[in-house]
């Protein structure tokens, strides 16, 4: 049975049961995507892993959760009964992510929190329930895979060159490694 067939069969299930099933799936996929309030694991895990591993994780793994939410919302739960809740969760994810990023002094933690914020933008597009919102979410997810992976790879270069990922000790990077500083700036 594929997702489209499951979606057709879902119409036979009472609305309350459908909402409960979608809620449980959203919690599971929300953990993977790191949406608020299920994002606490991400900022602590990415800074501790090697930069190459973090680049792959940041670029791909959180987007698996976003992809699962997109597939579930568009193929199985097409009525959009939880779109308003999803929108509020997305807004909270954006806010928590960016406020967390502002408070960081480590570049990997800063990028981890901004990643959470960006996931909020993707989920917001899904929550709109329109073709434009969905297209924007998909485009942004693909774009974010490339950009976030590149950023964490450059952070790996910065750590290798400077010996630290602390923002307080990277002020002279433009003088000691101008090419790496420019790569990160771009």
What are these regions (language model features)?
Residues 1-186:
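Hydrophobic transmembrane alpha-helices and their helix-loop junctions in integral membrane proteins
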